[in-house]
Regions:
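Sec-exported extracytoplasmic/periplasmic mature domains
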Residues: 40-50, 74-78, 120, 124-127, ...
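Metal-dependent peptidase/peptidase-like ectodomains
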Residues: 59-163
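Short acidic/His/Gly/Ser-rich catalytic and metal-binding motifs that mark active-site loops
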Residues: 13-19, 97-100, 164-169
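Extracytoplasmic/secreted envelope proteins and their assembly/folding machinery
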Residues: 8, 35, 39-42, 66-73, ...
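His/Asp/Glu-rich mid-to-C-terminal helical/loop segments that flank catalytic regions of hydrolases
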Residues: 43, 160, 165-214
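Catalytic-core environment of secreted peptidases
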Residues: 1-57, 77
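Soluble non-cytosolic domains of exported or imported proteins
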Residues: 25-36, 48, 63-67, 109-113, ...
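Acidic/histidine-enriched alpha-helical segments
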Residues: 51-59, 88-91, 204-214
Length: 214
């Protein structure tokens, strides 16, 4: 297909401290989990041909102001590819079971497009996408998706982390012990089966007039 579904995640984190002992910010949830979900989806489609073409992007520099995604979004050599993206799915902190339960995520900026509605209408294997419950934190404008929003591309981030209670966000304890592997595996399979159902005919997400492209 000429139309593209794009998937992304940032692979950088915030580095280390000068303290002795365990001083490395591993970033298992933020954002090795998102990269894992993206790679898992690509692996799903190794043996299954989707109706859309697919693009996978791993960004550096998110923690420094979304530098990697900005560079790709503004690269004029990719302008023709960008014009064909029907939607970009950015995965950000998906290591835990969300407050909505297993196999469920929230989508930032749900009030700005019908992407979540279309996903839920085509959802497979129990996948459920909820509106962002932390809307006051402006998460839609704080992750790599916003670099593509500024180009008027449908782009949202998908997450499971509970921003009200998470104690590992940008902390040294964001390590492998945070990861719920069963849930992450379930998300990979559910997203794969859901994306497999999408076609350029049944999946045409649109922004509404509430979104800001600035």
């Amino acid at each position: 297909s000429d139309q593209i579904l794009a998937y992304s995640a940032h692979f950088d984190h915030i580095g280390s401290t000068d303290k002795s002992g365990d001083n490395i910010y591993n970033g298992a949830d933020d954002n090795a989990s998102g990269v894992t979900l993206m790679i898992g989806i690509s692996d799903y489609f190794k043996s299954t041909e989707p109706a859309f073409s697919m693009m996978y992007m791993a960004f550096n520099g998110e923690e420094k102001g979304m530098k990697g995604s900005k560079a790709i979004a503004e690269n004029h050599l990719l302008k023709d590819k960008h014009a064909k993206i029907s939607a970009l799915f950015n995965f950000e902190m998906v290591a835990t079971v969300s407050q909505f339960g297993p196999n469920a995520l929230y989508m930032t900026g749900a009030e700005f497009s019908d992407l979540d509605e279309l996903l839920n209408a085509n959802a497979a294997a129990g996948l459920k996408v909820h509106p962002d419950p932390y809307i006051g934190q402006q998460l839609f404008y704080r992750s790599d998706n916003v670099s593509f929003v500024k180009k008027k591309i449908i782009a949202h981030s998908f997450s499971t982390v509970d921003m009200n209670v998470a104690k590992h966000y940008h902390q040294l304890n964001d390590d492998i012990n945070v990861v719920n592997f069963d849930n992450l595996t379930g998300l990979i399979n559910s997203f794969g089966k859901t994306f497999q159902k999408l076609t350029p005919e049944n999946f045409t997400p649109q922004y509404n007039d509430k979104v800001s492209f600035k």
